[in-house]
Amino acid sequence: MGNTEIVAMILAGGQGSRLGVLTKKLAKPAVPFGGKYRIIDFPLSNCANSGIYTVGVLTQYKPLELNAHIGIGLPWDLDRKDGGVSILPPYQEEKGGNWYKGTANAIYQNIEFVDRYDPEYVLILSGDHIYKMNYTKMLEFHKEKNADATIGVIEVPVNEASRFGIMNTRDDMSIYEFEEKPKIPKSNLASMGIYIFNWKTLKKYLRNDEANKSSSNDFGKDIIPSMLNDGGKMVAYPFEGYWKDVGTIESLWQANMDLLKSDNKLNLHDQDWRIYSTNPVRPAQYIGENAKVTNSLIVEGCTVNGTVQNSVLFQGVQVGKNTIIKDSVIMTNAKIGDNVIIEKAIIGNDAVIRKDCVIGTGDEIEIVAAKEEVKMGSIMKNSKAV
């Protein structure tokens, strides 16, 4: 294959159990976001925009829709003879196969894939975060620091720090302490789950970790602490842009709502750093004569005959007459009947809401699953149908 300076490996096998019915039939990285994207589009687009064209996507849970979405990688310019994008399911041995045992084991099982390109560096990414980042700048930082490993970090609120891998650094950003999800965090500098390793070094640690039967085969719990204990040079790369772990209903809803803010830091309209996706051709949106739309994202193919406020409507959504949708996310091809009220809710793909229904309006975010039908006159509040 020849030498490639850096290979990206995207961990995209997550079940996303905290997203409930939204991930019942698909992997978390395939969950729709922002009107016309899926979560996996963000790391894939970041790779393409960073000039990284050799990418492995490690799939596992319910991969069919994710695999179909990625295809041969055309939207991200990853349909290449040399390199490009490769879908990497768990390795199947003659004795039978197992799921990836952890993030480190997932990379271990694909050592042969990475070795085909003989890279100097490997970039490890999570497939379920929303952000825009230039990985080339992170690689330059890694080289300047002459590091064995570089971890992307972001400051988080202190009261949320226990949800993340937390590290302490010196003034030169070298890491001297790392704790995975500590009960009492010593700082608020959190790992973004973005790593650059010298490949030869990482390969040694992956093999040692695999041989350790007591290991959980995880980067945060095993690989990073082992490298630190051995005196490896590890540095933190600070990131100050928008970054969201959308692993919960609340965070997914909030990330969509963030797109509607006037000071939105993600800025999906930035032509210099576009987010690419697989999008079918749709007719132009139609806004009816009695419709009212304010502060919302309405994607092509939508038909709106009601009121839409502060909401995100994906492709092909139909909104009936005298219907009010507020603070909500309505996913692809959902059909909303007449005289419906939807507030603070996520409506899944191809869901059907019959007329005269009330969904949401409570303190918690209401969820309607993909392809679910809500019968005429139903009231759904705090996940209880009446």
From Swiss-Prot:
Alpha-D-glucose 1-phosphate binds at Y100, G165, E180, K181, S191. GO terms for biological process: glycogen biosynthetic process. Pathway: Glycan biosynthesis; glycogen biosynthesis. It holds the Pfam family Hexapep_GlmU. InterPro entries: ADP-Glc_PPase, ADP_Glu_pyroP_CS, GlgC_bac, GlmU/GlgC-like_hexapep, NTP_transferase_dom, Nucleotide-diphossugar_trans, Trimer_LpxA-like_sf. It catalyses: alpha-D-glucose 1-phosphate + ATP + H(+) = ADP-alpha-D-glucose + diphosphate. One of its GO terms (molecular function) is glucose-1-phosphate adenylyltransferase activity. CDD domains: ADP_Glucose_PP, LbH_G1P_AT_C. Its EC number is 2.7.7.27. It comes from the Bacteria. Keywords: ATP-binding, Carbohydrate metabolism, Glycogen biosynthesis, Glycogen metabolism, Nucleotide-binding, Nucleotidyltransferase, Transferase. The keyword ATP-binding applies. PANTHER family: GLUCOSE-1-PHOSPHATE ADENYLYLTRANSFERASE, GLUCOSE-1-PHOSPHATE ADENYLYLTRANSFERASE-RELATED. Homotetramer. Belongs to the bacterial/plant glucose-1-phosphate adenylyltransferase family. Involved in the biosynthesis of ADP-glucose, a building block required for the elongation reactions to produce glycogen. Catalyzes the reaction between ATP and alpha-D-glucose 1-phosphate (G1P) to produce pyrophosphate and ADP-Glc. This is Glucose-1-phosphate adenylyltransferase. The lineage of its organism: Bacteria, Bacillati, Bacillota, Clostridia, Eubacteriales.
